[in-house]
């Protein structure tokens, strides 16, 4: 068993949760998770983050013919879908150019005090457009540096049992519940920030089983990355499954407006939580495939890290990029253009070069059991070579959050002088499925297995 050098803080018991939303307001965790609807998840094999990101070059194995049938099922109106595709491509022209010109100015930095009193209308508009935000000043710098020192001591005390990736020189540590991590997850500034960010989501279905102002604790890993090139690179991707976005009926309903075709994609609401609650993100039960619903992914900085120092990269474009990613599998480059496109820069972006194809079973960038890869070949219209930008400099204690659908990556090289370190701490609400996840997370923790 891993050794912990200090006594852990007392954590509150699993009492009934009473949030501002209906659904869970009158039910305890026990009442929710004992239903047949939320049977225990199967125990996953142990693995590392490296295995999860193996397909980020965009190469995918062939899909069986049933996936062509799935495309036909989703495309109810060919003309409407073609109209939506052309409209999305047109808007992408201006949106990608804006990011190419402004760079990481598109990534908003706000002081913690703004979060405490509520963001302004202008700030909210920017956040919902870009899907990413840095919160500064909530955690004192020395406190965050103390967490990092505690993590180093924990690693040293358990050296023979520590796992991670790369295996010979670990950067991503498969450690989930050290003292420092629990202290960070329960820090008042993090909880307050998460409550606010979760409150930006809403329900479209009455009596939805969710409390959007009740954050729960999700056990995630941390990273301590020394200067130098990365052994493996986390290229551009979207977390929360890949082919599941289309294959799982509940997950597919999230993009209902986009798949309707025509101009309905403009009505897609990236902050409607209702259709996401029953979505299955891990149909293939893969190691390190997250099965909890995280509206906001996030990390808390443990170092001074800026562009070029192994930091996060994002595509600061939320709903428009999502609409494109959802529509992309239904279209292919016309044969006369495909034969001439020997490199990503040769791929024509004009709508007339693309054609609706429902006979092709392929889903570009998708691999069962992996994350959704985004490359210049699989998704050329996003122009990720110019639009995926490194976030501005962060200091120890700064919080970074990005929408669950946002395209993001990690810099391949770390050219700074010190380590680039973060604790991964997302904003996760109390829902019925997430309540069941907490039950299973507790069980796997007690058995010494990774989180489900």
Model-derived regions: residue spans:
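C-terminal catalytic subdomain
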Residues: 407, 422-426, 440
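Short, charged beta-turn/beta-strand-edge "cap" motif at the junction between a beta-strand
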Residues: 402-409, 413
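Double-stranded beta-helix
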Residues: 428-452
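Fe(II)/2-oxoglutarate
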Residues: 2-129, 159
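Hydrophobic beta-strand signal
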Residues: 134, 401-402, 424
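Non-heme Fe(II) oxygenase catalytic core, chiefly the N-lobe of the double-stranded beta-helix
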Residues: 41-42, 122, 127-130, 139-376, ...
């Amino acid at each position: 068993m891993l050794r912990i050098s200090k006594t852990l803080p007392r954590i509150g018991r699993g009492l009934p949760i009473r949030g501002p939303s209906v659904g869970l307001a009158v039910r305890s965790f026990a009442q929710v998770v004992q239903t047949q609807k939320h049977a225990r998840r199967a125990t996953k094999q142990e693995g590392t983050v490296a295995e999860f990101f193996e397909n980020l070059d965009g190469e995918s194995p062939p899909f069986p013919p049933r996936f062509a049938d799935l495309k036909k099922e989703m495309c109810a109106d060919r003309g409407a879908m073609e109209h939506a595709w052309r409209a999305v491509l047109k808007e992408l022209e201006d949106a990608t150019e804006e990011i190419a010109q402004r760079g990481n100015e598109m990534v908003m930095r706000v002081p913690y005090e703004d979060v405490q009193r509520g963001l302004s209308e202008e700030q909210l508009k920017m956040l919902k457009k870009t899907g990413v935000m840095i919160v500064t000043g909530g955690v004192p710098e020395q406190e965050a540096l103390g967490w990092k020192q505690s993590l180093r001591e924990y690693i040293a005390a358990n050296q023979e049992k520590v796992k991670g990736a790369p295996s010979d020189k670990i950067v991503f540590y498969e450690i989930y519940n050290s003292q420092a991590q629990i202290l960070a997850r329960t820090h008042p500034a993090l909880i307050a920030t998460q409550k606010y960010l979760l409150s930006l989501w809403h329900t479209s279905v009455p009596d939805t089983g969710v409390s959007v102002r009740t954050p729960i604790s999700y056990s995630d890993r941390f990273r301590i990355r020394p200067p130098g090139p990365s052994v493996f690179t986390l290229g551009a991707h979207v977390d929360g499954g890949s082919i599941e976005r289309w294959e799982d009926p509940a997950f597919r309903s999230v993009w209902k407006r986009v798949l309707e075709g025509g101009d309905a994609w403009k009505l897609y609401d990236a902050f409607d939580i209702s259709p996401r609650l029953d979505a299955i993100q891990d149909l293939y039960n893969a190691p390190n495939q997250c099965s909890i619903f995280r509206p906001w992914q996030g990390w808390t900085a443990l170092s001074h890290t800026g562009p070029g120092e192994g930091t996060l990269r994002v595509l600061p474009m939320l709903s428009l990029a999502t609409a494109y990613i959802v529509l992309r599998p239904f279209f292919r480059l016309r044969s006369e253009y495909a034969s001439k496109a020997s490199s990503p820069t040769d791929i024509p972006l004009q709508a007339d070069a693309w054609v609706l194809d429902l006979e092709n079973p392929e889903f570009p960038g998708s691999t069962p059991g992996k994350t959704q890869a985004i490359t210049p070949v699989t998704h050329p219209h996003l122009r990720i070579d110019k639009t995926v930008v490194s976030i501005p400099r962060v200091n120890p204690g700064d919080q970074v959050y990005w929408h669950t659908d946002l395209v993001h990556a990690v810099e391949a090289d770390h050219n700074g002088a010190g380590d680039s370190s973060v604790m991964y701490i997302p904003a996760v609400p109390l829902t019925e499925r997430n309540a069941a996840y907490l039950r299973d997370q507790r069980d796997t923790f007690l058995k010494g297995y990774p989180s489900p």
